């Protein structure tokens, strides 16, 4: 099925952001694990898998619309050098993705591509959950202090 070029462009923009986020979460997971924060590292690792599945969904949709998934135009990774920076960098990236998702949803709606819109809406819901989790981590650090937060982050299941 030949898709609308504007929708395909928006899907590719979101795909690029997801690909960056996959790498960012994965690297942060490994950094945190290396620092001894097993539980927190595991959360970020699982998050990278969630992002990978979302990217796969976009790739399949772009191909279905007879577009070419663009896996080459990648943005900049935001890599934190402390736990607080890691959380802040990932929150910034998730907020960037949120803005792109809203634009893509509006384009899909305007072009009457309701399947793409629904896919993007689902990804927006997941994105908002990620934003909420990251904001909660920042609030926890503010309330209980970084040393106490890191103590809980180091625990293994």
UniProtKB/Swiss-Prot annotation:
Q: Does the keyword Iron apply?
A: yes
Keyword tags: Heme, Iron, Iron storage, Metal-binding
Query: Where on this chain does Fe cation bind?
Result: 51, 94, 130
Q: Which GO terms describe its molecular function?
A: ferric iron binding; ferroxidase activity; heme binding; iron ion binding
Cofactor(s) of this protein: heme b
* Ferritin-like diiron domain: residues covered: 1-145
The job of this chain, per UniProt, is described as: Iron-storage protein, plays a role in protection against oxidative stress.
Give the protein's recorded name.
Bacterioferritin B
Organism, by scientific name, is Neisseria meningitidis serogroup B (strain ATCC BAA-335 / MC58)
Gene from which the chain derives: bfrB
């Amino acid at each position: 099925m030949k898709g609308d070029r504007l929708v395909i462009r928006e899907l590719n923009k979101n795909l690029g952001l997801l690909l960056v986020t996959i790498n960012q979460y994965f690297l942060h997971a490994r950094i945190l694990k290396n620092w001894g924060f097993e539980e927190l590292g595991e959360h970020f690792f699982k998050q990278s898998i969630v992002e990978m599945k979302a990217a796969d969904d976009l790739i399949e949709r772009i191909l279905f619309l007879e577009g070419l998934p663009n896996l080459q135009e990648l943005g900049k990774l935001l890599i934190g050098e402390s736990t607080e920076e890691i959380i802040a960098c990932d929150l910034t990236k998730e907020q960037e993705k949120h803005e792109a998702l809203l634009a893509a949803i509006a384009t899909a709606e305007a072009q009457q591509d309701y399947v793409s819109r629904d896919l993007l809406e689902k990804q927006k819901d997941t994105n908002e959950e990620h934003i909420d989790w990251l904001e909660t981590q920042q609030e926890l650090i503010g309330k209980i202090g970084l040393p106490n937060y890191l103590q809980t982050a180091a625990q293994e299941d």
